[in-house]
Amino acid sequence: MNILKYTSILAASLAAALPISAMQQQKSNIYKDGDRACMVGDSITASGAYTLALMTYYITRLPDTNIDFRNLGLSGDYCGGILHRMQSDILPNFDKQRSVGVLMVGMNDAKRENFSKKTLEKLGRPALDAKIKYNRGVYEKRLGEIVNLIAPNTRTLVLFTPSIYDQTADIATENFFGVNDELVEFGKIGAKTAEKIPNVRVVDMNLKMRTVNAELQSKEGKNKTIIGSDRVHPSFPGGFVMLNAWLERFSEPREVSTVEIDAAAQKLRKSFNCDISNLSFKDGAIAFDSLEAALPFPVENAARNLDGYMKFAQNFNREILKISGLQSGEYALEIDGKKVGAYSAKQLADGVNLATNTNTPQYKQAEGVYKKCVEFRTKAANFRGIIMVEASQRNTMDKLDIDGKIAHVKKLFDKTPQSNSFMYKTYKYYVENKKHEAERAAELPVLNAEIYKAAQPRKHSYRLVKTK
């Protein structure tokens, strides 16, 4: 079965059934309707923290711009591995006119063990420096080969500088100090490589992440990190920072919607990215219906503190309600008959950002979309495990039929302790799902389309009434 063809047909048919929403008044500077978002990388891509953030943003912000999200990350991968699977796993997903590629690789190429005290004691500084320099040259050569293969096969290739290795956090995991300095050098290599090719653009993830991480640790303590406890894999906070770097780099849409009402003149002064109807000024209350063209971006509790370091809500999550000409006092805001907040006349005159109000029905809907994006992330990561197992065992498994492959992995599974939870779960998933690989692949575009359906904005009734 041609899995890619089958999944594309499913995605297209489901996307065509999307309901009509408010007129969208903004667009992406990087994606177009019908694009494939092909994310290539190692476990940081495969595990999906930043891919989750990107997917959630684009589906909530531009729910009428259908993007086919494809996770092409593999745990443990490096430049050599990407080159090996280029023809079989990567390029078949790309389309020269309809795809935007993302490439981030380097964490494993940096060979973190080179920065351990044990390695330094064993080799001595001169020999170790020579080894690191040689390895850097290998990375430059292979990264160039990868870029030269992908760039001609996609409309745009976005090259990330490698995400940070947290070498400044005071946490239990052994610190291979110097790894992130090497990743910075890798980033310079990437930028130099990109200069030569017109359709390759760079996002300096490492700079943004280490800047925010440094501010976080300076203000909240060295035991804080936007990376996971292993110093390598970003959790949602890290993915959130990566999203912010992406949005800044491409000047992506800032607004959910804007509504400006002049209460004194009883007029709608402005509406952006929303359709306003049934505006009334009766019995001391202001009421109207709003159908927005977007949803607010739902920020996980674990990452809310990061807004102070990035100003994400101010810059990229603006759902503004501004009402001037009100009498001084306090006002209750109701949406669909439920109180969602209390604001002063001054706050309303200045404009309140409802995207940060977790009580609104729009935010609740966005949280539902996010949960579905998490489900997509999990399914994609599990599916990528099948490819990862076969890539890591290719010298043996390439010679086997499907039953032989399953038997081989079953032996690996039986030898793997549950304490090694990642490989235990990966082998288990492989054994249970290898014969259903096509079905598992087909589930992803179906879910992708379902998420877009869940993200279609709904009309809501607003009512503002003076309370004191």
Question: Where on the chain are the PLM-derived regions?
Answer:
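Short, functionally important structural connectors and interaction interfaces within domains
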Residues: 10, 36, 224-226
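Bacterial N-terminal signal peptides
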Residues: 7-17
